[in-house]
Amino acid sequence: MSKRMMILAMASMLISHAALAQKVAVKTNLLYDATTTINLGAEVALAPKWTLDLSGNYNGWTFSDNKKWKHWLVQPELRYWPCNKMMGHFFGLHALGGRYNVGNVDVDMNLLGTDFSQLKDYRYEGWAVGAGLAYGYAWTLAKHWNLEAEIGIGWAYTRYDKYECQSCGQKVADDEGHHYVGPTKAAINLVYVF
């Protein structure tokens, strides 16, 4: 191999290694971690100011007194970074999809036509899809570590079966539909940037 080819090969390896900087990140949402929900996210750079974030989570546990917030959820998000990707302010457009089995949860809240207090007396099993807009900010903690905060609002459509009690009751509604408008994303992410 000629000296020129060797230099060219080494230069291309250095350039490709430098090109990986701020191109890929993995993350965990600390809010989901606090609720025992297993979650993992990844983000890849698409262009100088655009990234694609994909997060997924799973909670398959039944807690004491038969409380359950069982679900799996996938949330892809296209992000725009006004300054540098994976640092500072960002705006996102996200979608969501998943399944759930929720009951015996005491949440006394009525939000824009959704009565969450019914989760105490009934169990709901179904699926949901939706979309929303988000705003967030990423702080650099160290060379490879970031902390991200994000909030999103949007719409979700769900279809569900409704049961009388939390685990064994008779079905009282079959294949009902509901439109939800409100928060669709909340995250405090611990991020490792490659």
Label each PLM-derived region with a short phrase:
Residues 35, 47-49, 83-87, 140-142:
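Outer-membrane beta-barrel channels and translocator barrels
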Residues 180-194:
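Outer-membrane beta-barrel "beta-signal"
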Residues 26-28, 42, 54-56, 76, ...:
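Membrane-embedded beta-strand positions of outer-membrane beta-barrel proteins
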Residues 22, 34-36, 68-74, 87, ...:
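Residues that define the transmembrane beta-barrel architecture of outer-membrane proteins
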Residues 24, 50-52, 86, 144-147:
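Repeated loop/turn-to-beta-strand initiation elements of outer-membrane beta-barrel proteins
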Residues 30-34, 56-62, 80-82, 95-101, ...:
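Transmembrane beta-strands of outer-membrane beta-barrel pores
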Residues 26-41, 59-70, 85:
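Solvent-exposed loop/turn segments connecting transmembrane beta-strands
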Residues 58-71, 99-127, 159-179:
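Flexible, solvent-exposed loop segments that connect beta-strands
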